[in-house]
């Protein structure tokens, strides 16, 4: 079902699946961004029945394989998450070994804590690629595997999900965004993704990008030997 979109240059569809036996309803809301060759979707599960739903677990919001015309190596470009160190958000690149799954997930229940940020770039041997983003503030996972020298697979969703829904209860999954790019330089894909985020994922007020305050704190006891009590002065706090 095509539905009206409130956003400019965005098309929107709603796909609905319903099981009359147990009353489980699944809705997939899809957004398309034609100017950026991007698609985004999220799943919603609703129990329309009169008793608890069957168990929902291991839901893969994306479970996809793509085959390219050229043979060769696939490269994964991603960034470190937050370790409270000078290496936070450091860019990383790995060549995917055929048949070995690269598993990515954050730590501590936070979407960007640990070794990975929730978006990454897959570069194919064909001078094409896809950037995948996971929209989730909790613990997500993403598995990427070079099935052979032409095929790449990816799966992603909520890492820990085993639950049931009470009658009339609803839950949503992480959202998934795929943006496709084509260029011999994979940085063209990164820059296209930045433009996509600015155009469609950045808050604007009266047509202008929102300006947020710079802020800092001492909750991680640094720089050593400082803590929030031993070094902080009024002037220092104002400067921070």
Model feature map: region roles:
Residues 134, 156, 175, 180, ...:
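Pocket-edge structural micro-motifs
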Residues 163-182:
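Short Pro-Gly-centered flexible turn/kink motifs
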Residues 132-140, 145, 177-207:
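Acidic/glycine-rich phosphate/pyrophosphate-binding loops and surrounding catalytic core
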Residues 57-61, 163, 181-189:
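OB-fold single-stranded nucleic acid-binding module
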Residues 186-240:
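An acidic-aromatic substrate-binding cleft motif
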Residues 129, 170, 213-215:
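A residue-level signal for beta-strand positions that form part of recognition/binding surfaces
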Residues 1-144, 159:
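Polysaccharide-binding surfaces and accessory modules of carbohydrate-active proteins
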Residues 146-166:
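Short acidic, Pro/Gly- and aromatic-enriched capping/linker segments at domain boundaries
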